[in-house]
């Protein structure tokens, strides 16, 4: 599905929501789109695939990795981040994180296409 998105993409993963992005990265070693990837996690011990992500970034100049450790940094927010006018935004993570981010993104860039998979832990 990410292959069909706009030329400018934003990927957002919260915690274990990184899984579908890792699957895509493994299947597509070279990117043909500009991607800003935001990966939010709670503590370094919960951050998975960091070596893979850094390696992917080093091999793909169009892939920009942003790591957000919520134990050290503020929570991920798009209040002050630039989003391309017609970007495709893919999000996967807990609904408590994804819903507020989706609102911020739509407010900031109403023409962006937003595709997300949120989940709740029971």
Question: What annotation goes with each model-predicted range?
Answer:
Residues 1-122:
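FNR/FR-type flavoprotein reductase catalytic core
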